[in-house]
Amino acid sequence: MKVHTSNYAIEGFTAAVDEKKLAQLCRENRISFTVDLGSGTLVNLEEFGLPHEPTPAETIAAGADLVTFSGDKLLGGPQAGIIVGKQDLIKKIRRNPMKRALRLDKMTIAALSAVMDLYRQPEKLISSIPGLRALSRKPEEINQTCKKIIKPISDWVGNSFSVQIIECESQVGSGSMPNRRLKSAAISITPNFSKR
C-alpha cells in the first residue's frame, strides 16, 4: 500500500517510489497494489487554478489495483470512505465480515449519489460544490469581500484596534494539500496600545 500525503507533509531528505514501479513490483510478486489518496478528487484541480492532486483515474492508470479516498474534503460530499478498483478485489472486500460494520447508511449513500451526479457536468462544479468554489476564489474577489466587511468590524472594535486589509497566503486545510498555499486577502486586527 502506498499512502499519498494528502493531509501531511514529510520534509527533509525523503524520496517516494513511483507508483508505476510499485505496481510492477507488486505484479511480479502477485501482490495487489493499493493506493490511499486521502482527500481525493475526481477532477484535475489545475483546471480551477489549484495545485495538482492525483485522481483515482490517474492512480489506476499508473497500475494501482485498488484506490481509496474520502467522500468529503476535496470531493465535496458526505464523510465516507470510497474504494474503487479491480472488480475481483472489490468482491473480496464485500465478502469480508467487517464490511457490515463499515458500510454506509442509506442517507450517506443518497448524499454521495447527489454529489457524484454533479460531476457529470464538470463545468458546473465550481458553482455546485462549496469547497471547490471557496478554493478557486481569486485573491481580488476575496479582497472585495474584505472591503465589504472591514467597516462594520472597525466600528465594532473601535479606536482600540487598527483594522486593515492585507495580502496573505492561506492554507487549504480540511485534510487536503498540506504545505500548499493560495494567494488570498485577510483582515488584520492589531491593538493600538497608544490609544488605551
Locate each region found by the language model.
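Helix N-terminus capping/helix-initiation residues
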Residues: 18, 55, 138, 173-175, ...
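Short, charge-rich amphipathic segments
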Residues: 32, 38-42, 74-85, 126-139, ...
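Structural motif of enzymes handling amino- and sulfur-group chemistry
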Residues: 88, 96-97, 104-155, 168-169, ...
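Conserved PLP-enzyme active-site core in the AAT-like
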Residues: 1-119, 153-154
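Conserved C-terminal alpha-helix-loop-beta "cap" of PLP-dependent enzymes
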Residues: 143-196
